[in-house]
Every structure is written in structure tokens, then in C-alpha cells.
Amino acid sequence: MFEKFNETYLEVNGIRLFVRKSDNVNAPPIVLLHGYPQTSAMWHKVAPMLLDDFEVICPDLRGYGRSDKPSSDELHETYSKRTMANDIVAMMRQLGHDKFDLVGHDRGARVAHRLAIDHGEMVKSMVLLDIAPGREMYENTRSDFAHAYWHWFFLTQKYPIPEQMIGLDPDSYWKLKCFNQAGHNSSFSEDALKEYLDAFRDDAAIHASCEDYRAAATIDIAHDNEDGTDKLATPLYIIWAKKGAIEKCFDVMDLWRQRAAKVTGESVDTTHYMAEEIPLVIAQKIINFCTNQVMEITHD
């Protein structure tokens, strides 16, 4: 995986981030942020397809993969999306960039959303994969969503309930959660799956990921509420899975129009793990949007 990429560690925001990065430093930078319970390896099919147009930067988020997993606090601020976004801002400044395109999937999309709110001057355009706004998802939760996204409500339980239960057999938990969400038709490559499972066997990673979700249900919502009625100004493109819970449970575009001033989007015929299932489609849509090429937007 990532044959044309370098691997490095960067000291940012008081922690060490593991980063995969292409060496075409004269190209416009784009950051790809992974989701739960994965690592930057989820981009191994998409990232190489972007190299003709971008310098591609793929970090492991704090708490995930080979990045540091700092101890948390009672308010879960250590794993708030604001703190995680500040990691990415510090990373990009250290790499010499003050403006970049931004792509996020799942938890990484939530970090990207917060980054664009707090540091909008740095984000040229943003593509978010298979999420609706977090606060609005909680506010509009019904039994169908709670059933499909059961892990949202399991991982937020008081320490150490989810940590101990997952830690008894992290491989089985990972496979049951992700293979089910992928419709039992997994497109995870052997190398990527090994990286995911190896990373998730770490007790610190399990705890950090629980803290990520605890933050989402508490301090992240508080930060959203502090934003008031101001809408995100960054040009935003939403792609969500026709075979996923977001499509079934929410009016995705309506929720995003409540939060963003310049938003387009569409559903695609895939599952939640679209970057690994239909990488060519996702890569082309990223290129088209972020390079301001004309594209036809349709959504159901």
C-alpha cells in the first residue's frame, strides 16, 4: 500500500501524529481524514489516484493507528473534534501549508467539519463522505437509526464498560461491526485489514475511540451550539451511501443546508466504506469538485 508515499511522524499540538504523504510538494495540498475504526490505510486505493492533481496527506487521527493516544479528561476535550481539528491545522502549518482541500470519511468527516468551522480561511473546499451533521443526527434519532448505528450509543457508555467488552475480543468486534456495515461484501484489502486489526488490538486505541464518541455526544454538541445560526461558508460536497443508514434515516441534504451555505451532494450505489468499495468513483468526484470542474450533481 502507498508505494508512492513517504511515512513520517510529526510533533503537533503536544502529540505525535503518524502521516503518510506524497512527495509531489509543488502540487496543491489535499488532506484525507479516515474514520472509525480504521486508519489512514482506508485511503490506499483513492490516494494514488489523486497524485496527478494534489500533494496528498493522510494522517492517522489522534487515538488511532500509529498516532499518539493521550489520556483523556472528564469533559472528553482531549478527543473533541475541535482538538482533533487543531492537530490537523498544526500538521499542515508544519508542512508549510496555510490553505488546502479537505476530505473526510466518518469520524474524519466530523473532524473536517469542525476544522472548516474553526479555521475556514484555511479550507479551499471540502468533501465529506457518508455523514450528516452530528448534532442534527442526535436530535433526529429514531429507532431505525439507533438500531443501525448501535455503536454510537454503546461506545458512549461510562468507562470502562465498552472498553472491557471490546477488549475481550477486539478482532471479532471489529469484523462484526465493519463487515455488517459493509453488507457482508467486504472490499477491505488483506494489507489494510491487517493494519486495522493490529491497531485496534491496542487497549489505548480502544479507549481513545470510545472517548472520540463520548466527546461527540457531549462537548462536540456544545461546540456546535456555540456556533449559533452562522452557516459554514466553505464550498461543501456531500457523498453518502445508498446502501447505508444515513440514506435510510435522514434527509441528508436538508440537514446540511441547515449548517452550510454552499453545499451540493449526491448518493452513490455503495456501502459506508465507499473509498475502498468504489475508489475510482470517489477519487474522480473528489478531483472534479476540488478542482472546480463542471460536474452533474444528482441525488435521490
What are these regions (language model features)?
Residues 1-8, 15-17, 23-25, 29, ...:
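Flexible "cap/lid" subdomain of the alpha/beta-hydrolase fold that forms the substrate-access gate
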